[in-house]
């Protein structure tokens, strides 16, 4: 009887309740963008913040014997960033410990060393696809600031293969967007297929895309794919305006906005007007300008905003203070890059992707942007539509649990009633036997 009771309790009450609690926890879990701390130390926050918005963390096994290394899979570049020995990381790839490591070539580009080597690689993607690579060529970049410690293969996922961005789909499950991708083959032969014209009829575009056309450029190390967009003006704080028409390039590799160097003069006025401190670092003929202020200077920069505008095509992108600046420790940062050697471009970092996503329509072959609303920015919150679905699912699960408990109690009542009758019959039999024995004893006497 005790064993049967334990069995019924475990399978009919405890197990359903446990499974339901796990389901509820999964739905209620806030997708934290800083879960990387279980892989990396907290000191690597700036490095992670720079890459996280269009890449996501996963694990790979590399080398023989296997070394389990956390890294960032970049769907846009079809490449993989992992921590090297030069990074302040708890785990890094050490080729000296791998029997299958083979150096193919080594080249120096200023302060950057590019290694081409082969080794054994295995990792799972989307929890459904795994890659096993041997004798595959990897590229390793070692930079002074450790911002990129290593890059594994620009064609890691195969030629022409579109790669789903799990982070975007997981956090932003819009009803009108089911399958959107933004990864492309980096073969120059296929660039003609990606030169899509801008969708002028934006007002009648029910899904709210802003489509742009592609262009490309390359350097000595690798080829990049950028998406260009022309602007009539750039408003800063709704007053200072950069009115000269310019072309901004939105680089899906690093989530950057690249524009004309003439913007630098305008931006210098902004620094002077707001009395903003700027730390300038000269690295390989490129100036990295880190603009930062202490927390008490929030009010000073609260009206800081940039607006990219095109009148005839009726589109604009606005970045305000909360989009441009992000907090690391006790400082507020805005990263601006200016190329000092050629004076050809300025570059904003990842804050753009806090407000706008790159999306790709696989059916119609369009790439574009979609804007986040305030409830759905990359802060780990889920879409309200998903919250409604979550509530419905939890409600159904709770009803199922209640039904299971009622059925369990009902069957328990029936079993208990039957056992009560059995025990009562046995008791009556014992009483009759006792009476019979008593009468027999009296007769014998």
Place the predicted regions along the sequence by residue.
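Classical protein tyrosine phosphatase
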Residues: 68, 72-100, 255-283, 413-415
């Amino acid at each position: 009887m005790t064993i049967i009771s334990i069995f019924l309790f475990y399978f009919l009450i405890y197990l359903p309740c446990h499974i339901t609690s796990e389901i509820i926890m999964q739905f209620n879990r806030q997708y934290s963008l800083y879960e990387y701390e279980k892989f990396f130390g907290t000191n690597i926050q700036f490095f992670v913040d720079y890459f996280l918005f269009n890449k996501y963390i996963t694990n790979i096994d590399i080398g023989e014997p296997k070394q389990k290394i956390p890294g960032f899979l970049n769907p846009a570049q079809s490449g993989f960033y992992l921590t090297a020995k030069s990074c302040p990381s708890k785990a890094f790839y050490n080729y000296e410990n791998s029997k299958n490591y083979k150096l193919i070539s080594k080249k120096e580009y200023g302060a950057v060393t590019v290694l081409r080597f082969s080794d054994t690689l295995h990792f799972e993607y989307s929890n459904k696809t795994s890659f096993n690579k041997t004798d595959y060529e990897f590229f390793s970049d070692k930079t002074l600031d450790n911002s990129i410690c290593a890059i594994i293969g620009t064609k890691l996922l195969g030629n022409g293969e579109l790669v789903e961005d799990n982070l975007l789909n997981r956090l932003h499950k819009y009803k009108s967007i089911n399958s959107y991708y933004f990864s492309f083959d980096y073969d120059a032969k296929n660039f003609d297929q990606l030169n899509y014209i801008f969708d002028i009829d934006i007002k009648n575009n029910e899904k709210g895309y802003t489509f742009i056309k592609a262009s490309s450029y390359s350097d000595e190390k690798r080829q990049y794919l950028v998406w260009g967009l022309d602007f009539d003006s750039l408003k800063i704080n709704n007053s200072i305006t950069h009115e000269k028409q310019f072309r901004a390039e939105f680089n899906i590799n690093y989530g950057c906005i690249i524009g004309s160097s003439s913007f630098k003069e305008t931006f210098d006025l902004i620094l002077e007007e707001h009395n903003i401190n700027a730390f300038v670092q000269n690295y390989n003929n490129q100036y990295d300008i880190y603009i930062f202020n202490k927390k008490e200077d929030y009010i000073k920069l609260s009206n800081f905003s940039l607006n990219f505008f095109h009148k005839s095509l009726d589109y604009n992108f606005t970045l305000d203070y909360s989009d441009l600046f992000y907090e690391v420790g006790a400082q507020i940062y805005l990263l601006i890059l200016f190329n000092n050697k050629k004076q050809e471009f300025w570059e904003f970092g990842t804050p753009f992707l806090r407000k706008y996503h790159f999306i790709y329509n696989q059916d119609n072959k369009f790439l574009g942007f979609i804007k986040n609303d305030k409830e759905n920015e990359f802060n780990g919150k889920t879409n309200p539509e998903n919250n409604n679905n979550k509530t419905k699912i939890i409600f159904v699960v709770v009803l199922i649990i209640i039904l299971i408990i009622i059925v369990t109690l009902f069957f328990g009542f029936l079993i208990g009633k039957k056992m009560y009758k059995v025990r009562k019959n046995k008791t009556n039999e014992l009483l009759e036997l006792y009476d019979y024995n008593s009468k027999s004893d009296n007769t014998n006497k």
